[in-house]
Amino acid sequence: MVGVGGGDVEDVTPRPGGCQISGRGARGCNGIPGAAAWEAALPRRRPRRHPSVNPRSRAAGSPRTRGRRTKERPSGSRLGDHGRGRALPGGRVGGRGRGRAPERVGGRGRGRGTAAPRAAPAARGSRPGPAGTMAAGSITTLPALPEDGGSGAFPPGHFKDPKRLYCKNGGFFLRIHPDGRVDGVREKSDPHIKLQLQAEERGVVSIKGVCANRYLAMKEDGRLLASKCVTDECFFFERLESNNYNTYRSRKYTSWYVALKRTGQYKLGSKTGPGQKAILFLPMSAKS
């Protein structure tokens, strides 16, 4: 109420005795006549809801934040389609998995461990030959021949162990006879297939029959013969091919190769060439 002098006057309207006014209505007035009607006349306050509980505000959002992100994706979070996990920095990328492996990439797995590195392929070893142990891929690295070119006995310690040259074409071993003939034979017990390879220079070798005491030579007409003395026709370029077979090409007649036919006879040098099976040989140990 407002007083005559403009000052405020306290409201002294009588209320039922024993009533206490609270923020949500009168308490203790249920037993007083007329208290119910008086309480109904009081203004009621509706309880306020927290903004986070209001479903409309949660669905629609405020105009200021609608249509934009309020938080940036943390660094190292997972990238990809419907992923739910957040991997550590350097985490996996792509897929729908929920794994948290820090290093795994791709896939849909849910593993939590780092993938084990794939084992390196085993080194290619020597393949066993049909007639014994094979020195596949070996290149002769031997000292040079004596300057006098003598055909005497080999000085001890100057040569590697004797070899057998196994031809891929027909499965023959290169054989040098004491009378100078050259051919192939399948029996590995034949003593004339035991050969001594000696390096004259890098990549160049001579081939000598241990029992025949003769050197393999390529003649000008392409024939293979065994010479008692070392000449310029007795040296061959030794090359390791990609299939682990060796080829022996004449140093004097550079387009001709040592070769054996499927019948076991030697092949004329003029009829040989790269890629033929007849020119492929495997050096095998003669001790077995």
From Swiss-Prot:
Gene3D superfamilies: 2.80.10.50. Residues 113-132 have a biased composition (Low complexity). The modification Phosphotyrosine is found at Y215. Residues 72-84 have a biased composition (Basic and acidic residues). The record marks K261, R262, K267 as: Important for interaction with integrin. This is Fibroblast growth factor 2. This protein binds heparin more strongly than does aFGF. Phosphorylation at Tyr-215 regulates FGF2 unconventional secretion. It comes from the Eukaryota. Monomer. Homodimer. Interacts with FGFR1, FGFR2, FGFR3 and FGFR4. Affinity between fibroblast growth factors (FGFs) and their receptors is increased by heparan sulfate glycosaminoglycans that function as coreceptors. Interacts with CSPG4, FGFBP1 and TEC. Found in a complex with FGFBP1, FGF1 and FGF2. Interacts with FGFBP3. Interacts with integrin ITGAV:ITGB3; the interaction is required for FGF2 signaling. Interacts with SNORC (via the extracellular domain). Interacts with glypican GPC3. CDD domains: beta-trefoil_FGF2. GO terms for cellular component: cytoplasm; extracellular space; nucleus. The modification Symmetric dimethylarginine is found at R108, R110, R112. There is a cross-link at K228 (Glycyl lysine isopeptide (Lys-Gly) (interchain with G-Cter in SUMO1)). The modification Omega-N-methylarginine is found at R108, R110, R112. It is found in: Secreted; Nucleus. A motif (Cell attachment site) lies at residues 179-181, 221-223. Acts as a ligand for FGFR1, FGFR2, FGFR3 and FGFR4. Also acts as an integrin ligand which is required for FGF2 signaling. Binds to integrin ITGAV:ITGB3. Plays an important role in the regulation of cell survival, cell division, cell differentiation and cell migration. Functions as a potent mitogen in vitro. Can induce angiogenesis. Mediates phosphorylation of ERK1/2 and thereby promotes retinal lens fiber differentiation. Residues 1-142 form a propeptide. GO terms for molecular function: fibroblast growth factor receptor binding; growth factor activity; heparin binding; integrin binding. Its main location: secreted. Keywords: Angiogenesis, Developmental protein, Differentiation, Growth factor, Heparin-binding, Isopeptide bond, Methylation, Mitogen, Nucleus, Phosphoprotein, Secreted, Ubl conjugation. The gene is FGF2. Pfam families: FGF. Residues 261-277 are annotated as: Heparin-binding. It comes from Pan troglodytes (Chimpanzee). Heparin binds at N169.
